[in-house]
């Protein structure tokens, strides 16, 4: 991260016109692939849109963060569970890329019930000169065939195709909240409210249940699983977080069913801060391993915390994301905003973390310098290549010209989903139905 963390540069933004934006257009997940060349977004309408980095822009410092639409496809359709009389939304909950092994790209996408493996490939040639079919693909009358032709490949305009290669269904009773690809690249896991399943990419009709916290009597249920992720380097290790603010690290070598954790991370509650909302705001909405695998980052309603895998009793770092909302918890409870699930991400070197807030604000915290900055993703101040100015929220007292009052924050505008390029300071921020791409300020 450059020294001036308090200034970022917007390089491009993909905007949909508010006049025709619908609920289906709201972006529900954002994810860079392992090289950062592709950026995938999923929305509430079940669509996946993939953006590709402009090749010419890589060598031009001012344009190195420009992405264009590469492929768009319908990943999930709305369904109906007739046994339970429940509608299954088409909304894309999570997208996860697999490392590229050949010319094609592979990604996982999931809604509440079904995970799909997609292959995204390019085609710039088409076969011609079939003997038994005409150019439109219709069968020819064998009696009209007088010569034997050798089919040839002809150049054509580049076409990007997305095809479903695997469908992993019928394994989750509750809503899927997480998917995570294992470092062995042969397996992945999917987590719902009460269970975590382990899948092999080649087997769609069977999965192994590795965590099950469902009590025999559902009235005894005290917590649910909120997020889960595999360790980036050790294929036997994974973590999952709960609505009680705890994190469990499990080792699949110890037991096939990982109901008994290897490590248990929990911060003791400060009795002086105890309130009616304590349990709600302590629920963890996201958990992420650092790229090094040494740390875990968690996000609850008001804070982002960094945990060392070797210290279970408290986090090594705690960052206040929007502590000024502590006095507003009652109204946030009434309008259901207190249940919003904010995600968090690391930069490529694990030195900076990023997470979202309200009013289309998002926050960055430099772990080394302990400096932080609040930035805004909005149409009004986001012209291409404009410098983003830090924003400040004023709590009571006199408000400066460049500050915004906590009472005037728009809670309908929220940054829940963000992504960071794996090796460069390029970030993607989803603000409702708009996607913004930001890059480092270039002097």
Swiss-Prot record:
An annotated Gene Ontology molecular function: protein phosphatase regulator activity
GO CC terms of this entry: cytoplasm; cytoskeleton; cytosol; mitochondrial outer membrane; mitochondrion; protein phosphatase type 2A complex
Positions where Phosphotyrosine occurs in the chain: 295
PROSITE patterns given in the database record: PR55_1, PR55_2, WD_REPEATS_1
Record has Calcium as a keyword: no
GO biological process terms held by the UniProt record: mitochondrial fission; mitochondrial fragmentation involved in apoptotic process; neuron differentiation; positive regulation of neuron apoptotic process; protein targeting to mitochondrion; spermatid development
Tissue-specific expression: Expressed in the brain. Isoform 1 and isoform 2 are expressed in the forbrain. Isoform 1 is more strongly expressed than isoform 2 in the olfactory bulb. Isoform 1 and isoform 2 are weakly expressed in the cerebellum. Isoform 1 is expressed in the testis. Isoform 2 expression is undetectable at birth rising to adult level at day 14.
Highest taxon of the lineage: Eukaryota
Entry-linked InterPro entries: PP2A_PR55, PP2A_PR55_CS, WD40/YVTN_repeat-like_dom_sf, WD40_repeat_dom_sf, WD40_rpt
SUPFAM superfamilies noted in UniProt: WD40 repeat-like (SSF50978)
Keyword set includes Cytoplasm: yes
Positions carrying Phosphothreonine: 298
Keywords: Apoptosis, Cytoplasm, Cytoskeleton, Membrane, Mitochondrion, Mitochondrion outer membrane, Phosphoprotein, Repeat, WD repeat
Expression induction or repression: Up-regulated postnatally and in response to neuronal differentiation.
Gene3D superfamilies per record: YVTN repeat-like/Quinoprotein amine dehydrogenase
Modified residues (Phosphoserine): 275
WD repeat ranges per the UniProt record: 22-61, 87-128, 171-209, 220-260, 279-317, 334-375, 410-442
Role: The B regulatory subunit might modulate substrate selectivity and catalytic activity, and might also direct the localization of the catalytic enzyme to a particular subcellular compartment. Within the PP2A holoenzyme complex, isoform 2 is required to promote proapoptotic activity. Isoform 2 regulates neuronal survival through the mitochondrial fission and fusion balance.
UniProt remark on domains: The N-terminal 26 residues of isoform 2 constitute a cryptic mitochondrial matrix import signal with critical basic and hydrophobic residues, that is necessary and sufficient for targeting the PP2A holoenzyme to the outer mitochondrial membrane (OMM) and does not affect holoenzyme formation or catalytic activity.
Family: Belongs to the phosphatase 2A regulatory subunit B family.
Subunit and interaction comment: PP2A consists of a common heterodimeric core enzyme, composed of a 36 kDa catalytic subunit (subunit C) and a 65 kDa constant regulatory subunit (PR65 or subunit A), that associates with a variety of regulatory subunits. Proteins that associate with the core dimer include three families of regulatory subunits B (the R2/B/PR55/B55, R3/B''/PR72/PR130/PR59 and R5/B'/B56 families), the 48 kDa variable regulatory subunit, viral proteins, and cell signaling molecules. Interacts with IER5 (via N- and C-terminal regions). Interacts with TOMM22.
Name listed for the protein in its UniProt record: Serine/threonine-protein phosphatase 2A 55 kDa regulatory subunit B beta isoform
Highest classification ranks of the organism: Eukaryota, Metazoa, Chordata, Craniata, Vertebrata
